[in-house]
């Protein structure tokens, strides 16, 4: 039997399969389908025709709009029907036609989406992705498998992110951009192929980062990408100078981390 809270409101034309867990205050509209291994925490709302399936947990207060499919099998030739999972955080908005897939067994079997995110119509989160908090994915954005999107990233409409690519916190990706390489925190990337166009100064300002700090980050950016060495060599060379600047340290740590992808740069030649 399903575990359904007394205060949950389920339309008689919805299907909630035996075994599902439905929390307090959940609302499920007509023609929705909730699978047997799904957990909907308090005050989740499913509008008409929304589907939540697979081994999926949806955090409190999240709203899922019509025709979204959350928790479908991974779109991977390597998936053999294993019991993999999707976790969606609290207070997310998942608009019409959004698709989110569970993970694949070979890579831990988990797709994880954080809190307070906005997924606009027809955007896609593939298997094994990690999406942080306060992320905005505009209409038709596509994340391939194993992508990492850090906190407060904005992805413009129709942009596509290559598998295993990382996009650092507070980065901005312009509409219709092809993100083939890692994007540094606070970076601004546009185009196909995607190239860095400087820093996301507007986003940094909106985040309350002091103007003097923004100027320091700009100087560090110039030293990293216009220095005589490789990007990683230049980043290592300025670490002591900027050890007291949280934002620069985040960029330097991102550059130094192991990754399957090269780094996006301001030029067509990628510097590692």
Swiss-Prot record:
Major localisation: cytoplasm
This protein's name: Acyl-[acyl-carrier-protein]--UDP-N-acetylglucosamine O-acyltransferase
Highest taxon of the lineage: Bacteria
Gene3D superfamilies (UniProt xref): Hexapeptide repeat proteins (2.160.10.10), Udp N-acetylglucosamine O-acyltransferase, C-terminal domain (1.20.1180.10)
Gene responsible for this protein: lpxA
A molecular function (GO) term: acyl-[acyl-carrier-protein]-UDP-N-acetylglucosamine O-acyltransferase activity
SUPFAM superfamilies for this protein: Trimeric LpxA-like enzymes (SSF51161)
Subunit: Homotrimer.
Family: Belongs to the transferase hexapeptide repeat family. LpxA subfamily.
Pathway annotation: Glycolipid biosynthesis; lipid IV(A) biosynthesis; lipid IV(A) from (3R)-3-hydroxytetradecanoyl-[acyl-carrier-protein] and UDP-N-acetyl-alpha-D-glucosamine: step 1/6
UniProt EC number: 2.3.1.129
Compartments (UniProt record): Cytoplasm
S-S bridge residues: none
Substrates-to-products reaction catalysed: a (3R)-hydroxyacyl-[ACP] + UDP-N-acetyl-alpha-D-glucosamine = a UDP-3-O-[(3R)-3-hydroxyacyl]-N-acetyl-alpha-D-glucosamine + holo-[ACP]
Keywords tagged on the record: Acyltransferase, Cytoplasm, Lipid A biosynthesis, Lipid biosynthesis, Lipid metabolism, Repeat, Transferase
GO CC list: cytoplasm; membrane
């Amino acid at each position: 039997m399903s575990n359904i809270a007394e205060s949950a409101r389920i339309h008689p034309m919805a299907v909630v399969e035996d075994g599902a867990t439905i929390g307090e205050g959940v609302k499920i509209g007509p023609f929705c389908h909730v699978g047997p291994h799904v957990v909907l925490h308090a005050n989740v709302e499913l509008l008409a025709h929304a589907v939540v399936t697979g081994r999926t947990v949806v955090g409190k207060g999240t709203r899922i709009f019509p025709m979204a499919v959350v928790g479908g099998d991974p779109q991977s030739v390597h998936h053999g029907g294993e019991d993999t999972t999707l976790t969606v955080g609290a207070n997310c908005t998942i608009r019409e036609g959004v698709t989110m897939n569970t993970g694949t067994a070979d890579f831990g079997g988990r797709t994880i989406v954080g809190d307070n995110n906005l997924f606009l119509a027809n955007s896609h989160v593939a298997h094994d992705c990690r999406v942080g908090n306060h992320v905005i994915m505009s209409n038709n954005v596509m994340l391939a498998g194993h992508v990492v999107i850090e906190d407060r990233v904005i992805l413009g409409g129709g942009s596509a992110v290559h598998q295993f690519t990382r996009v650092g916190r507070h980065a901005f990706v312009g509409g219709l951009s092809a993100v083939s390489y890692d994007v540094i925190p606070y970076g601004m990337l546009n185009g196909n192929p995607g190239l860095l166009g400087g820093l996301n100064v507007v986003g940094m300002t909106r985040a309350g980062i002091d103007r003097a700090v923004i100027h320091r980050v700009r100087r560090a950016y110039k030293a990293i990408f216009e220095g005589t060495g490789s990007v990683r060599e230049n980043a290592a060379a300025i670490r002591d100078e900027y050890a007291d600047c949280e934002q620069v340290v985040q960029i330097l740590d991102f550059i130094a981390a192991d990754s399957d992808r090269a780094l996006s740069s301001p030029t067509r030649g990628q510097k590692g």
